[in-house]
């Protein structure tokens, strides 16, 4: 009987030692798992970055095509400032294409520690509704800003969105700035100021409105920056910490966020479209289109899809990195858009000049600076894992 108790005590002691000192194969598998997760993370970041650049490029191409065919370059005062509710609606209306993807992407099992489901649902509904109204306001103000001022002036003001993002993320998200992130911010602000594309929907020089209408772009920048920071907060404090999707950051979160927010924003823009009476002009817009009604519809559909591509990539970068990085990538697309517009359209006196070349180089350096910060962060995680492994061995 005594031998049996002694053997049990020995077995228990060996099991505890085994837990405290994992086998080499187990440590190796943990290291491989960390490396695999980091590789998956990098792939996700690069895919989202590509979606943002692709969406931005397609949007500026199709917007220029739309306003050229809509005879906006004729500077007809009666036509110049119409269609802003429609453009705002187009930015959000294509969200149904994401619904099949939402069900295709796997969803991890929720953690048993998830807080009260009913309370969580109420918080989510309030969050999505608030963000939807904010996005609708940004979409409307963004559409107005492009038409009420020169595009260069519009780009200069909209560059303040990064400044507002820095302010909001420092307050809301407690974001920590590193030396390389600050360098990236400075580079992208300079590049954004000199690398903007031409926009065919802007008014003639004698029609610039540098009054309250043009400065509405500031309000659009504030709404855009605030929405990004609130999205990051919702990922960190609601969808991740409540264990609704387990303990992981998964792409399904991005799709859920975009579908719900865009649906609310679309309803708001649709109400604005009918309340303003702008819907009555839709038939005239299609008939006035140079290429005909078919191309009119196709251009709007293309714009709607392009906006969704851009938004999914943007929110994905917020999830995997931060709202600051997401905004920097969006602004890095400006010199690239200028290059694409020069190739696709034959605007008078528009070329890819030396300032734009410098802006393109600056954008690449800005991305490189931020990527270096991300590389150092992942490397630090690996070093900390190795240190913990050495402590276990000792």
UniProtKB/Swiss-Prot annotation:
The modification Phosphoserine is found at residue 29. InterPro entries: PUP_plant (IPR030182). It is found in: Membrane. Keywords: Membrane, Phosphoprotein, Transmembrane, Transmembrane helix, Transport. It is a multi-pass membrane protein. Disulfide bonds: none annotated. The chain crosses the membrane at residues 43-63, 85-105, 124-144, 152-172, 180-200, 211-231, 254-274, 301-321, 328-348, 352-372. It comes from the Eukaryota. The keyword Ion transport does not apply. Residues 1-24 are annotated as: Disordered. One of its GO terms (cellular component) is membrane. Residues 1-20 have a biased composition (Basic and acidic residues). GO terms for molecular function: purine nucleobase transmembrane transporter activity; purine nucleoside transmembrane transporter activity. PANTHER family: OS09G0467300 PROTEIN-RELATED, PURINE PERMEASE 17-RELATED. Belongs to the purine permeases (TC 2.A.7.14) family. This is Probable purine permease 23. It comes from Arabidopsis thaliana.
């Amino acid at each position: 009987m005594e031998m049996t108790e002694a053997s049990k005590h020995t077995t228990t002691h060996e099991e505890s030692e085994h837990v405290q000192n994992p086998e080499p194969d187990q440590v190796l598998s943990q290291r491989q798992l960390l490396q695999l997760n980091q590789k998956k993370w990098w792939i996700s970041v690069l895919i989202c970055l590509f979606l943002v650049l692709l969406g931005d490029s397609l949007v500026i191409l199709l917007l220029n095509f739309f306003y050229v065919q809509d005879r906006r370059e004729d500077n007809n005062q009666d036509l110049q400032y119409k269609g802003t509710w429609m453009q705002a609606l187009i930015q959000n209306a294509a969200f149904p294409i994401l619904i099949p993807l939402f069900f295709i992407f796997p969803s991890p099992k929720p953690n048993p520690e998830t807080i009260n489901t009913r309370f969580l649902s109420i918080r989510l509904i309030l969050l999505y509704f608030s963000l939807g109204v904010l996005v609708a306001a940004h979409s409307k103000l963004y559409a107005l800003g492009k038409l009420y001022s020169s595009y260069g002036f519009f780009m200069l003001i909209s560059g303040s969105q990064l400044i507002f993002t820095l302010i909001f993320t420092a307050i809301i998200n407690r974001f920590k700035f590193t030396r390389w992130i600050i360098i990236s911010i400075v580079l992208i602000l300079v590049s954004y100021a000199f690398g903007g594309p031409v926009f065919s929907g802007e008014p003639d020089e004698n029609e610039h409105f540098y009054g309250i209408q043009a400065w509405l772009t500031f309000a659009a920048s504030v709404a855009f920056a605030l929405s990004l920071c609130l999205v990051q907060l919702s990922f960190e404090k609601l969808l991740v910490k409540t264990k609704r999707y387990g303990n992981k950051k998964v792409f399904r979160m991005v799709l859920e966020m975009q579908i719900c927010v865009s649906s609310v924003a679309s309803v708001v823009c649709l109400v604005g479209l009918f309340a303003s009476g702008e819907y009555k002009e839709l038939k005239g817009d299609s008939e006035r289109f140079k290429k005909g009604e078919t191309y009119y519809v196709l251009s709007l559909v293309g714009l709607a899809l392009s906006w969704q591509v851009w938004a999914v990539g943007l929110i994905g970068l917020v999830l995997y990195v931060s709202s600051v990085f997401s905004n920097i990538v969006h602004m890095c697309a400006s010199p690239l858009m200028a290059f694409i517009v020069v190739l696709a359209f034959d605007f008078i006196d528009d070329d890819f000049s030396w300032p734009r070349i410098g802006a393109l180089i600056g954008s690449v350096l800005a991305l490189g600076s931020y990527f270096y910060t991300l590389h150092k962060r992942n490397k630090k995680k690996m070093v900390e894992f190795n240190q913990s492994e050495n402590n276990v061995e000792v």
